């Protein structure tokens, strides 16, 4: 298949390769900086890290304002409750407790340090007790571990004693054999000839 270029009536189209080369050369020399794929002069803006939006505080819910009648009714209900509780229970009333606490605070303003000292002493005693209990647990664990170590050491020593005893018995038997051969040589003058069985290897 052959390629062919047809001449058109339009004069703006290129007809020769020389014209195409000249056009490409001119476009390469006169190209704009904006057409560059990787421009060097362009400043790239830095990306900003995303920040969380500040949360707007919620508006407090509108509280219902109580009227004077409701306040009076609440006071009456509270007084009735206090009266019934005072009649039914032999314990002192709330007012008596508040008054006694206030009196104690006024009278013992100088003696406030004493309860704190007692509380601190109690804390020290409690911490000392906990330290003693921790120390006891630690010593118990150490004693248990030492007992385990002692049993293992005694087991190793018995094994070594058995090995040494076996070695001694072997040495003793070899010594008795040497003594018997020596006595045979002394008495007879020569050692006895003993035939050894020769093992034959199967092919």
Swiss-Prot record:
Regarding how it is modified after translation, the entry says:
Phosphorylated at multiple sites. Phosphorylation is necessary for cleavage activity. Phosphorylated by the viral B1R and F10 kinases.
Query: Keywords, A to Z?
Result: Elongation factor, Host cytoplasm, Phosphoprotein, Protein biosynthesis, Transcription, Transcription regulation, Virion
Gene Ontology cellular component annotations, sorted alphabetically: host cell cytoplasm; viral envelope
Q: What induces it?
A: Constitutively expressed in abundance during viral replication.
Q: Which Pfam families match?
A: Pox_Ag35
Q: Where do the segments described as Disordered lie?
A: 25-74, 80-99
- Residue numbers bearing the Phosphothreonine modification: 84-85
List where in the cell it is found: Virion; Host cytoplasm
Q: Where is the composition biased (Basic and acidic residues)?
A: 25-36
Compositional bias of kind Basic residues: 49-67
**Summary of the function given for this chain in its UniProt record:** Involved in the co-transcriptional or post-transcriptional endoribonucleolytic cleavage that generates sequence-homogeneous 3' ends during late transcription. Involved in postreplicative transcription elongation on intermediate and late genes. Also involved in DNA replication and in multiple steps of virion morphogenesis. Required both for inclusion of virosoplasm into crescents as well as for maturation of immature virions (IV) into mature virions (MV).
Q: Which family does it belong to?
A: Belongs to the orthopoxvirus OPG110 family.
Q: How does it assemble?
A: Interacts with the DNA polymerase processivity factor A20. Interacts with B1R kinase. Interacts with the late transcription factors VLTF-1 and VLTF-3. Interacts with the late transcription elongation factor G2. Interacts with itself. Might be part of a transcription complex composed at least of G2, A18, and H5.
Q: Protein name, please? A: Late transcription elongation factor OPG110
